[in-house]
Amino acid sequence: MTGKKRSASSSRWLQEHFSDKYVQQAQKKGLRSRAWFKLDEIQQSDKLFKPGMTVVDLGAAPGGWSQYVVTQIGGRGRIIACDLLPMDPIVGVDFLQGDFRDELVMKALLERVGDSKVQVVMSDMAPNMSGTPAVDIPRAMYLVELALEMCRDVLAPGGSFVVKVFQGEGFDEYLREIRSLFTKVKVRKPDSSRARSREVYIVATGRK
């Protein structure tokens, strides 16, 4: 019974995925993921990226966000990216494969940043979802707290932070924490984000 339900759910997800207009557009354009469109919408609204910037990309694989940012920051810009999963190389992206929750991986990432002035930290990280909010939301909140800790460590004054967050327990407290660190904070739900998803994107600018 459980197997049948899981199979039916998987079939629905696959049908929705391949009929999704953003998935289809990503395939036509040769993009790595539909996430490219989410960041494009955010850039149109908030103008986060400029030529020559240094950007940290957390939860980077398969590379949709890094692929987008390369087009915005140009050849003089730099992206330091990290993910637990492997990612095919992108020109202009320094990729570190490892678990961001691991202290040694965090240290290695900070070493790659070095003395660079980071203008944007972005995080599209999400845990493997079990389908149980009581389990998934705390896991997701732990990841976004780590991303905010990275901002504290490397983000230059005036810098920006964009992070995927799942609405639920801890969201309001996290939003207040971000507002204490940045001068302007917006909560975005891009059109390319699936309506049924609890995900939103917090866009914070003007690191204090």
Curated annotation (Swiss-Prot):
The keyword ATP-binding does not apply. Its EC number is 2.1.1.166. The active site is at 164 (proton acceptor). The keyword Transmembrane does not apply. One of its GO terms (cellular component) is cytoplasm. One of its GO terms (molecular function) is rRNA (uridine-2'-O-)-methyltransferase activity. Its main location: cytoplasm. It comes from the Bacteria. Keywords: Cytoplasm, Methyltransferase, rRNA processing, S-adenosyl-L-methionine, Transferase. S-adenosyl-L-methionine binds at residues 63, 65, 83, 99, 124. It is found in: Cytoplasm. It catalyses: uridine(2552) in 23S rRNA + S-adenosyl-L-methionine = 2'-O-methyluridine(2552) in 23S rRNA + S-adenosyl-L-homocysteine + H(+). Belongs to the class I-like SAM-binding methyltransferase superfamily. RNA methyltransferase RlmE family. NCBIfam families: PRK11188.1, rrmJ. Specifically methylates the uridine in position 2552 of 23S rRNA at the 2'-O position of the ribose in the fully assembled 50S ribosomal subunit. This is Ribosomal RNA large subunit methyltransferase E. It comes from Salmonella arizonae (strain ATCC BAA-731 / CDC346-86 / RSK2980). The gene is rlmE.
